[in-house]
């Protein structure tokens, strides 16, 4: 978003500080100042008041304006047809500059012109953003300015425009008030959004019947405010197109507070508005899309946000509608319209009720200043922002995260600054600012703490000297590639409806998320591999071996395998190749898994994974999975093996015995195999046959080894 540095400094009471210092502080606060642009290169311009207008008799399209300035009366010629007597103008007078051009008195068609009247374009504004009133000639306005005053200061024209890139999880930052609040806290000046109140002069009788999943708040206002010229210029600096009074007012609220809004007017007998979703069609477009419609009591549309605005009568009361629409619906509308307006972009962000509260408290101040009456908020109550989430404080963890030695005084001073932007602290916990959606974990608080403690202080932190150690090479990717697996990468986030969670991990619904398909942290990597496998099967790829290693819910690190080629027994062997642990496999009792083909994996009686196939309801037949929680496995120490002993070479031929296990359908062979595998010097145990007879599993294994192995097996059977 584009911000006026002059307005930010004015709001935050930073006129005593240099432009560069304020810009540097924004960067230190973590805001990316992508570009700095000077609005114009003009100097020496003056306010003037037109006393008289007459035509230049020697020119077809020139008018001679007698203009009163603070020091004298001057005659200035212009071709603009919108000049009016007794109105004020801006003018370059002799000695004024625009870039490398210095203005002088000059003779035009037989008459001296002592300067030039100024248009909006000559002030540095984009011609395509001007409405017809601003673009019809020179700037003409009511005589409200002191002719002695400096237009560059009064109209904030000596300005730098900052292109500030905000993180996607800081929608509140698209607001002059929020940025000014953080600057004031940083510089310790007198400005705060906190502890503001909302009120009203009367109670509105409007009832909003909301038949959608969106939230709608409103304010009844007795008269449409007209923005001051300096605020119109502020909209232009933000690259907002100037429209009618209602559009300008709504856009001004947007850039000041971050709250999108629409103006709605009702006839006097109307006291009810209905919000529905309904198909809408654009002229010359074949497709339709479902969008929001505000209907009157006769079910006729009054307002279709982003499709058609209502014409607002200037001196009649109206309603300022402040929505929080469904984010997915906004995204669809944005794609359909191929439109990227500031309002539509903000509607697609996950701002919270705190942003609405900031808008309401600002409107209280703004409308009172304009002497316009307004109602108490409709549908909004301060309790919406008073429900606070508290997180535990741990200052030792804070020091560890930041890598800084912090004194109690450092912590107390910085927390006092953080209170100015809305933090609340007690001895053991804190709550984040009411308008922030990005503070979910203690580490988020630590990041804010560092912003206001001072990033530059990280320079004083000396790195400790540590002894270097060459790490052991990670052979897992090599082993997996050798076994025929291909690596995949999937989204960390899944939709709220996806509940595949065989290991019963705890996830967390995020307050901010990129889309409705990605709202919480995944429970299982195997689930992601299942979706990738099905996608490839649709592409007629039948032989699939995939693996992924990554994070899942509960701060766990996981490895998952998926195969349409290997059996579950093969996957067990691969697990042994990857991690030389003595795993136990027990029948899996889970609604998410196929009970006849799945097992839980244990290590030292700790559940560390699962193996087999997912439940039939998911329709992933003939795909075998293995998922292991590496974060749990790594916490369990490996049992040290005994000393290696060498024996004389035995060149006798290996022999084998075939044994068959007869097991119930839900039983697994692993406990029985463990007994057999305790026989010393077994060379191999191989599955050679598996059949089901009379609802019994008949599983045949071939055990290969020297004579003493076969003797032990024979003795075991006897």
From Swiss-Prot:
Cell location: Cytoplasm
EC number(s) from the headed UniProt entry: 6.1.1.20
Cellular compartments per GO CC: cytoplasm
UniProt GO BP: phenylalanyl-tRNA aminoacylation
Entry protein name: Phenylalanine--tRNA ligase beta subunit
Cofactor descriptive note: Binds 2 magnesium ions per tetramer.
Cofactor: Mg(2+)
Top-level division of the source organism's lineage: Bacteria
Positions of the tRNA-binding domain: 39-153
Cross-referenced Gene3D superfamilies: 3.30.56.10, Bira Bifunctional Protein, Domain 2, Nucleic acid-binding proteins
The entry's keywords: Aminoacyl-tRNA synthetase, ATP-binding, Cytoplasm, Ligase, Magnesium, Metal-binding, Nucleotide-binding, Protein biosynthesis, RNA-binding, tRNA-binding
Sequence positions that bind Mg(2+): 438, 444, 448
Source organism (scientific name): Mesomycoplasma hyopneumoniae (strain 232) (Mycoplasma hyopneumoniae)
Catalytic activity: tRNA(Phe) + L-phenylalanine + ATP = L-phenylalanyl-tRNA(Phe) + AMP + diphosphate + H(+)
Alphabetical list of SUPFAM superfamilies matching this protein: Class II aaRS and biotin synthetases, Nucleic acid-binding proteins, Putative DNA-binding domain
Location of the B5 domain: 386-460
Record's keyword annotation contains Lyase: no
Gene Ontology molecular function terms on file: ATP binding; magnesium ion binding; phenylalanine-tRNA ligase activity; tRNA binding
Sequence similarity: Belongs to the phenylalanyl-tRNA synthetase beta subunit family. Type 1 subfamily.
Subunit and interaction comment: Tetramer of two alpha and two beta subunits.
Main location: cytoplasm
């Amino acid at each position: 978003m584009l911000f006026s540095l002059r307005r930010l400094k004015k709001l935050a009471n930073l006129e005593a500080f240099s432009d560069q210092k304020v810009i540097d502080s924004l960067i230190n606060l973590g805001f990316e100042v992508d570009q700095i642009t000077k609005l114009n290169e003009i100097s020496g311009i003056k306010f003037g008041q037109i006393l008289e207008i007459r035509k230049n008799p020697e020119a077809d399209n020139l008018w001679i304006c007698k203009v009163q300035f603070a020091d004298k009366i001057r005659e200035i010629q212009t071709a603009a047809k919108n000049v009016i007597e007794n109105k004020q103008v801006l003018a370059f007078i002799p000695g004024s500059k625009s870039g490398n051009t210095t203005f002088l008195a000059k003779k035009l068609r037989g008459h001296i012109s002592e300067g030039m009247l100024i248009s909006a374009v000559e002030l540095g504004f984009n011609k395509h953003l001007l409405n017809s009133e601003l673009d019809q000639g020179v700037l003409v306005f009511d005589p409200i300015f002191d002719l002695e005053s400096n237009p560059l200061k009064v109209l904030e024209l000596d300005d730098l425009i900052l292109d500030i890139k905000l993180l996607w999880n800081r929608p509140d930052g698209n607001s002059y008030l929020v940025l000014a609040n953080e600057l004031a806290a940083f510089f310790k000046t007198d400005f705060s959004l906190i502890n503001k109140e909302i009120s009203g002069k009367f109670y509105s009788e409007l009832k909003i019947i909301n038949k959608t999943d969106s939230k709608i708040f409103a304010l009844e206002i007795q008269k449409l405010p007209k923005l001051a010229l300096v605020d119109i210029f502020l909209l232009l600096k933000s690259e907002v197109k100037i429209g009618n009074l209602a559009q300008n007012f709504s856009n001004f609220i947007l850039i000041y507070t971050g709250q999108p809004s629409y103006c709605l007017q009702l006839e006097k007998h109307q006291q009810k508005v209905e919000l529905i979703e309904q198909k809408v069609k654009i002229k010359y477009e074949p497709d339709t899309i479902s969008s929001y419609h505000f209907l009157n009591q006769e079910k006729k549309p009054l307002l279709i946000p982003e499709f058609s605005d209502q014409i607002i009568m200037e001196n009649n009361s109206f309603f300022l509608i402040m929505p929080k629409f469904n984010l997915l619906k906004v995204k669809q509308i944005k794609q359909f319209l191929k439109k990227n307006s500031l309002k539509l972009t903000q509607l697609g962000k996950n701002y919270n009720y705190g942003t609405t509260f900031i808008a309401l408290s600002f409107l209280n101040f703004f409308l009172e200043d304009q002497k316009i009456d307004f109602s108490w908020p409709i549908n909004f109550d301060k309790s919406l922002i008073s429900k606070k989430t508290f997180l535990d404080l741990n200052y030792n963890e804070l020091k560890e995260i930041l890598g800084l030695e912090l004194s109690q005084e450092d912590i107390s001073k910085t927390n006092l600054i953080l209170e100015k932007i809305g933090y609340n602290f007690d001895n053991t916990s804190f709550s984040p600012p009411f308008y922030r959606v990005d503070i979910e974990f203690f580490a988020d608080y630590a990041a804010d703490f560092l912003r206001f403690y001072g990033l530059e202080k990280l320079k004083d932190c000396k790195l400790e000297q540590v002894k270097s150690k060459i790490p052991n090479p990670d052979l897992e990717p090599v082993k997996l590639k050798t076994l025929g697996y291909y690596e995949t990468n999937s989204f960390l986030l899944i939709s709220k409806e996806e509940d595949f969670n065989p290991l019963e991990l705890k996830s967390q619904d995020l307050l901010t998320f990129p889309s409705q398909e990605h709202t919480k942290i995944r429970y299982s990597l195997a689930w992601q591999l299942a979706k990738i496998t099905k996608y490839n099967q649709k592409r007629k790829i039948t032989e699939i071996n995939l693996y992924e290693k990554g994070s899942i819910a509960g701060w766990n690190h996981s490895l998952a395998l998926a195969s349409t080629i290997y059996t579950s027994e093969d996957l067990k062997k691969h697990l042994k190749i990857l991690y030389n642990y003595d795993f136990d496999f027990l029948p899996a009792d889970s609604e998410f898994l196929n009970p006849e083909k799945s097992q839980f994996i244990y290590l030292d009686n700790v559940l560390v994974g699962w193996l087999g196939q997912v439940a039939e309801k998911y329709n992933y037949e003939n795909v075998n999975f293995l998922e292991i929680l590496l974060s749990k496995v790594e916490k369990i120490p490996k049992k040290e093996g005994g000393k290696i002993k060498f024996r004389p070479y035995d060149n006798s031929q290996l022999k084998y015995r075939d044994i068959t296990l007869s097991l119930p359908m839900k039983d697994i062979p692993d406990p029985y195999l463990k007994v057999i595998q305790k026989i010393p010097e077994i060379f191999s145990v191989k599955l050679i046959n598996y059949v089901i007879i009379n609802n019994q599993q008949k599983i045949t294994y071939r055990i290969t080894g020297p004579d003493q192995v076969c003797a032990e097996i024979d003795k075991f059977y006897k």
